Amino acid sequence: PESEIMCVIKADGYGHGAIFLAREYERLGVKRFAVSNIEEAMQLREHGIKSPILILGFTPADLAKVLADNNISQAVLSEEYAEELSKYAQRDSVTVKAHIALDTGMSRIGFMYQNIDRDFASIDTIERVCKLPSLDFEGIFTHFFVSDEAEEGKEDTLCQYKCFDDAIAKLS
């Protein structure tokens, strides 16, 4: 109930123009955006986009101050990365907003949680990460790898959803 729509406008809005889309989406009431990297996020800021932005990919941890100063949230992809980001945020006396990336089947980025019975150690790791200083965790996300395939991907998407839902319940 407290979740907001976050429009993903990475790769120049998938070729449609990220700045144009961000302005239109803001006008329509969208309050959050997601992009691929720091360059895309800063381009939106340089063109007056004020809404919160989440970077889905990797940002060098030594840019913690840039993230914090520009109201940009960072996807946390691993415990090691979280520790590094926390270290730089503390060094720069800032708090970085963050989201947990949960890998429920895409096998690209995030904390592995593809099997409820096997990957339970990831929950403990995420709980540790969320206690790190100078990081403010706002949310968690996953990527459904075949959700656009109506019948063929239905079972896989449902399995991913169950993993995601289970992780949320365990972390709540």
Model-derived segments and spans:
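Active-site-proximal beta-alpha core segment in soluble small-molecule metabolic enzymes
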Residues: 3-170
